[in-house]
Amino acid sequence: MIDVVALGELLIDFAAKSTDSTGYPTMAANPGGAPGNFLAALNAYGRKTAFLGKVGNDAFGNLLLGTLNAAGIETRGIRVDDSVFTTLAFVTFDESGDRAFSFARKPGADTQLRWDEVDKSLIDEAKVFHFGTLSLTDEPVRTATQKAVAYAKMQGKLISCDPNLRLPLWPDEDAAKEQMLWSLHQADVVKISDNEVEFLWNCTPEEGADKLLTEFGVSLAMVTLGPDGCLLKTKTASFRAACPKVHPVDTTGAGDIFGGSAMARLLELDKSVSELTEDDLKFIGSFAATAASLSTEHSGGIPSIPEMDAVLKAMG
């Protein structure tokens, strides 16, 4: 049995590490993509996962497949395409470790996944179907994602969504908002950042969580607040978790690691989302906030996921 299957982008994050003797940046190639980071966190904390997506038949595609396999993620749902190159992201940082992105994705292999290439048996086997909005930027992967979500809902799967705003990948803000809002309407569990809440509704995290619960039919809203922790809310309970003090060097993948860690704890509880108590939300949120915070002390997405013992120790 698979706990979680995710559909979405796989890419290489090129992160500036230093400068050479001429002043040009040197960059590290880190395997990433939000759904892959999300699944890798789940695997790190004892869950079984599978990926649906596409990479190019190139060195970076091979690196991504090898990385996911090493993380224990089932990769039989990943297609390899000879005609397009694996997507690349270039990440730069400010003094606090926050990121700015540019992409080589015109097109990237992840955008070329077709519905007929999606391994539906992996959805059948899973308890949870997870997706983000970067697989809604372009065809044919947009249609593949929409049909996969509909299929998963028909099969009675728990639907998890991370809207994951990356404006450079959209033609304009309105297109991004349209697809993000569609995604949120599909989901039972949502992980969203305070910045994304502000982008969509220009409101506070608390107001955003309430919107998700009352207007979108979401059962569990999780709003990440950067260094201020997170807010978790259901219709009957809420909890706000703090983060441990860390010295961030790279926030790449921290939100994904939060989401995967939270989902791992939710699955450990083995109860309906509608039945979650405040203590349950503390069990989920405190662990996820700590795991995400610790990940920022290391570079990259998947390589930065902290071990379970390190998270529990930091929680005290």
Regions found by a protein language model. Give the residues of each.
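Conserved phosphate-binding/catalytic region of the ribokinase-like
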Residues: 1-5, 150, 205-316
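Glycine-rich phosphate/adenosyl-contacting loop at the front of the ribokinase-like
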Residues: 1-74
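Glycine-rich phosphate/pyrophosphate-binding beta-alpha loops
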Residues: 87, 133-137, 292, 298-301
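Conserved beta-alpha-beta core of the PfkB/ribokinase-like small-molecule kinase fold
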Residues: 128, 136-211, 228-229
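Structural alpha-helical scaffold elements that stabilize or flank donor/cofactor-binding regions
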Residues: 121-122, 182-183, 214
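Conserved N-terminal subdomain of the carbohydrate kinase-like
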Residues: 48-133, 312-316
